[in-house]
Design a protein with these regions (language model features):
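Surface-exposed short loop/turn segments
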Residues: 27, 69-74, 81-126, 130, ...
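A short beta-turn/loop motif at secondary-structure boundaries
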Residues: 32-33, 78-80
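A structural "domain/chain start" motif
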Residues: 3, 19-61, 65, 72, ...
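Bacterial N-terminal signal peptides that target proteins for export
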Residues: 1-10
Length: 170
């Protein structure tokens, strides 16, 4: 009977230690300080020529939603503990590979976002940098046909890369 009581006590201590550890570590891979409670995102402007009219709005919403889903931080309109701002600075279409007739076999759509990140509790994490991602599509497909499929994929990857650089420190 005494062995069972000792075993139960050790089991209880083990469970409490594991549960307490969950407060420190995140299953989403974030490395954000426990001091951080809020985040703010100033609307990213569209500084690039071309692209869908609603691209900056779509990007802003995707970025906010990703932080809300993957952190415990609360959104504030301004002055969050961490703050992101920037603009979409490039929307480019370029040929990737040529065929025998000097035509592009594949085209590449590239989007670049300039980001300024501020962490009010740790200024060493502040940065300004560009994030770029692209998707290729066949030359037989027009940009008008490819845009509705490729732009959301590119924006999703840009959001993930920004999140990893700010919240996951990858």
């Amino acid at each position: 009977m005494k062995i069972k009581r000792v075993f139960n006590a050790f089991l209880l201590v083990f469970i409490l230690a594991v549960l307490n550890g969950c407060k420190i570590y995140s299953f989403t891979g974030t490395t954000l300080s426990a001091d951080l409670k809020t985040f703010s995102i100033q609307n990213f402007s569209m500084a690039a020529a071309g692209g869908p009219q609603n691209m900056s709005l779509t990007f802003n919403e995707k970025l906010k939603e990703y932080y809300q889903r993957n952190t415990s931080l609360k959104f504030k309109n301004t002055d969050g503990d961490i703050h992101l701002e920037g603009s979409i600075i490039a929307y480019e279409l370029s040929p990737v590979s040529a065929t025998a007739g000097d035509r592009a076999a594949m085209n590449r759509l590239t989007i670049t976002v300039e980001v300024k990140f501020v962490n009010k509790t740790n200024e060493q994490e502040d940065f300004e940098k560009e994030f770029t991602f692209y998707q290729d599509f066949p030359q037989e497909q027009s940009l008008t046909q490819a845009e509705p499929i490729l732009v959301p994929k590119i924006l999703d990857q840009l959001v993930l890369n920004i999140f990893n650089s700010t919240a996951a420190s990858w």
